[in-house]
Amino acid sequence: MNGSLNIRGLPKLTTSTSISVSSTSASSTLSTTTLSSNSIISSITTDTSGTSTSSRDVSSGQSTLNSISTTSSIIVPSITPPSAAKNPNVWHSEDSDGTVFIAVGSIIGGIFGGVLIWWMITSYLSHVKTKKAYHSDMEEQYMSHLNGGSPHKVGSYHDDKSKIENPFSSFYMDDLESSNKKKYSRVSLVSDNPFDEDLDYALDTTEQVRYNPIQDETNHYANKKDTLFISPTKEVLQQQRQRRESKLFDNPSELPSTPPSNFKTLMLKPERSASPERKSRSPIRQHRKNNSSVQLTPLKLDSGEDDFKKTPTKKKNVNNSNNNNKHKKTPSMYLDDMLENDN
């Protein structure tokens, strides 16, 4: 039986393993090695003597398989949100960017613009009202001066509508009327008896104002004591005339029916010595009280003319006064000459 068996040598098991990066290649290598090992084991069963050797080879093959190390890498995909275009489940705005800021800025700008317009309108209305009030006040003051300091006289004010339409019309008309007024005479130092009733009556019949050596025309400043010289005699005469006028207005029956006999003589207007043309009109005699050349025309020409011609002393006094007037010149004469040259 032993001679009939042919002893054959055991096939040599040669295993080769390779480490791959991916887990799939390692598993394929292991499966190939396992298949080859199974085929070797199945072939060993035919020979009993070689069992131990084959078992050692199988065990060495299994230890070799256990030493295989595998590596694997995980790749994470990127996450992208779904598109909102034509997606009913995602809400998207159709307005442009910054709409909220534009709306808020427009509201704030409108508020500031309204406040600015309101301020401009109120400022303009206030300016117009102030201008009208100023013109009205100036017109009232002007009219009160023209009416003698009484702003409540009849016809001193115009209609309010005419004031607003043309506030300067009344000024023009008043200036025109005042420029057409006649010149009033002034009273300086009257004769020896300044309290004569006949002379006072003559002065009452004429319009008189306070003595003003600078201005010849009456204006609204005539009642003010702005001049350098004020005649005390004139002050007394005015006070007496005002008292007499008040009595006459209270009792109109006391008015004289006929003027006095020497009315024409008394109606002679008093003249100033400063005017050159007035010197030629009437002779100037020396004052008997203050020894000055300021004098009116003689009051009684009819009765005193003959005495003046007959008495040589009076003629001498007149000559002396004329000589004094020729050589002496008062400061007011220089001032009057300057004013007349300006006019």
Curated annotation (Swiss-Prot):
Q: What is its main location?
A: membrane
Q: Which domain of life is it from?
A: Eukaryota
- Specify residue ranges for compositional bias: Basic and acidic residues: 269-280
| Segments of skewed composition (Basic residues) | 281-290
| InterPro entries listed in its UniProt record | PRM
UniProt-annotated stretches for the region Disordered: 45-65, 235-343
Per UniProt, subcellular location reads as:
Vacuole membrane
PANTHER family attached to this UniProt entry: CHITIN SYNTHASE 3 COMPLEX PROTEIN CSI2-RELATED (PTHR36089:SF1)
**Similarity field:** Belongs to the PRM5 family.
Name-wise, this protein is Vacuolar membrane protein Kpol_1003p17
Q: Which organism is it from?
A: Vanderwaltozyma polyspora (strain ATCC 22028 / DSM 70294 / BCRC 21397 / CBS 2163 / NBRC 10782 / NRRL Y-8283 / UCD 57-17) (Kluyveromyces polysporus)
